[in-house]
């Protein structure tokens, strides 16, 4: 299976039990910042934004004072799982990022998708990739 099909079929798909509800954007990005696959709507990010995200995974809380920036959008960092998941909020939407051994799985959402639904979609794929040694 190609990385693009993971994005298309597992991240940008309808959310279970909520036909028509799906993430706004999604991507799988290597720890080095190289994009493995992304939805057409995933924002163009700057290397320093990805560096900040990786730093927060290695030193949890790093982004709390400044916020998480991706594609010029600032998200307020909310409770996550230290070293494993970063969650951010902006207005009626937000972002979930799951770290695997080699990649970061990104999901961006807006209402009517809920934070919990985004977390479920992103973390399920991230957990699967971890199980596969990725």
UniProtKB/Swiss-Prot annotation:
Its main location: cytoplasm. SUPFAM superfamilies: Profilin (actin-binding protein). Signal peptide: none annotated. The modification Phosphothreonine is found at residue 114. It comes from the Eukaryota. GO terms for molecular function: actin monomer binding. Phosphorylated by MAP kinases. A motif (Involved in PIP2 interaction) lies at residues 84-100. Keywords: Actin-binding, Allergen, Cytoplasm, Cytoskeleton, Disulfide bond, Phosphoprotein. It is found in: Cytoplasm, Cytoskeleton. InterPro entries: PFN, PFN_euk, PFN_sf, Profilin_CS. GO terms for cellular component: cell cortex; cytoskeleton. Disulfide bonds join 13-118. SMART domains: PROF (SM00392). Belongs to the profilin family. Occurs in many kinds of cells as a complex with monomeric actin in a 1:1 ratio. Binds to actin and affects the structure of the cytoskeleton. At high concentrations, profilin prevents the polymerization of actin, whereas it enhances it at low concentrations. The variability of the residues taking part of IgE-binding epitopes might be responsible of the difference in cross-reactivity among olive pollen cultivars, and between distantly related pollen species, leading to a variable range of allergy reactions among atopic patients. PANTHER family: PROFILIN, PROFILIN-5. This is Profilin-4. It comes from Olea europaea.
